[in-house]
């Protein structure tokens, strides 16, 4: 059974990698099709948040998501656990 479990785990790993790549591709497509102001908005949000909390540049993510007839601006900010500046 050890060999079968080993082969099965590779399938799960391959499936996980495939799912991750699909997510990355979908995000890249969203960024290409999104408005030109999104990267600037992301940088400006980062600068404002940095005034209050010490965060990295990759901690702020701005995405435009289509939800039926509406476009939804999805802003994700990963804050540090300590919350100190």
UniProtKB/Swiss-Prot annotation:
Family under the similarity heading: Belongs to the MinE family.
Coiled coil, from the record: none
Function: Prevents the cell division inhibition by proteins MinC and MinD at internal division sites while permitting inhibition at polar sites. This ensures cell division at the proper site by restricting the formation of a division septum at the midpoint of the long axis of the cell.
GO BP field: division septum site selection; regulation of division septum assembly
InterPro entries: MinE, MinE_sf
A cellular component annotation (GO) from this entry: plasma membrane
Pfam family of the protein (one): MinE
Secretion signal span: none
Protein origin, superkingdom: Bacteria
Originating organism: Xanthomonas campestris pv. campestris (strain ATCC 33913 / DSM 3586 / NCPPB 528 / LMG 568 / P 25)
Keywords: Cell cycle, Cell division
Protein name in the entry: Cell division topological specificity factor
The keyword ATP-binding appears for this protein: no
